[in-house]
């Protein structure tokens, strides 16, 4: 029986993903425990287990939720719908992102890869686009204009900022690249894809 488990890079801590795990919150600890259980069950032959470490997915459709990363979709999704959105971290905050399409592509590849392609380690980091929250806001302005981008409220929240900055912004995804997986080109392309997949979202035309 094969099981593909989704996890995250949050348990790695703020250092590069090639370092030993240093989770800085309960979420990271729980993800790390889950990975080890899958690895142990695979070692014993109970399952054919694969841990896929997802990057923060943006832009997600739907409504805001209670996750610390929720604003990384909300600060784009809500303004495009004409709604205000809070951004609780400074513009220079670095983040590692992946579009929904790239994330799904990675999960499918993980499920279909042969044992020889996958290798002995059960866990793999999916590729990430490294960007900053400020660059995300700038991409929104390029896509939809200043009026839409002005719907972002820069409202600092130290608790959220402490969590987000404990996540790695630089990810070692060499194994994923060997499987043919690549990160998104830039955040402009992520917004363009979101608009294409959500035709009800119609931002004003911008000449900028």
Label every model-predicted segment.
Residues 2-17:
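N-terminal Rossmann NAD(P)H-binding glycine-rich loop of SDR-like oxidoreductase domains
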Residues 24, 55-69, 89-101:
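Glycine-rich "substrate-gating" loop/helix at the edge of Rossmann-like oxidoreductase active sites
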Residues 35-61:
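Conserved beta-loop-beta element that borders a ligand/cofactor-binding pocket
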Residues 103-107, 126, 136, 176, ...:
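Non-catalytic, hydrophobic alpha-helical segments
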Residues 106-161, 201-206:
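Mid/C-terminal beta-alpha module of Rossmann-like enzyme folds, strongest
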């Amino acid at each position: 029986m094969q099981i593909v488990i989704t996890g995250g890079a949050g348990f790695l801590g703020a250092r590069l993903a090639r370092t030993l795990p240093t989770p800085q919150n309960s979420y990271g600890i729980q993800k790390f425990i889950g990975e080890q259980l899958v690895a142990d069950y695979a070692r014993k032959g109970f399952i054919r287990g694969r841990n896929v470490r997802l990057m923060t997915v943006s832009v997600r459709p739907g409504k805001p939720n209670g996750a610390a990363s929720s604003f990384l979709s909300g600060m784009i999704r809500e303004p495009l719908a004409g709604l205000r959105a809070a951004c609780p971290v400074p513009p220079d905050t670095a983040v590692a992102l992946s579009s929904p399409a790239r994330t799904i592509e990675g999960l499918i590849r993980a499920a279909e890869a042969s044992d020889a392609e996958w290798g002995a380690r059960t866990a793999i980091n999916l590729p990430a686009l490294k960007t900053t929250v400020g660059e995300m806001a700038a991409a929104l302005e390029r896509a939809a204009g200043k009026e839409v981008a002005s719907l972002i409220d820069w409202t600092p929240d130290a608790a959220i900022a402490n969590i987000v900055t404990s996540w790695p912004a630089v990810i070692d995804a060499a194994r994923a690249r060997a499987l043919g997986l690549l990160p998104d080109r830039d955040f402009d392309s992520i917004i363009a894809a979101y608009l294409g997949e959500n035709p009800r979202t119609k931002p004003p035309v911008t000449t900028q």
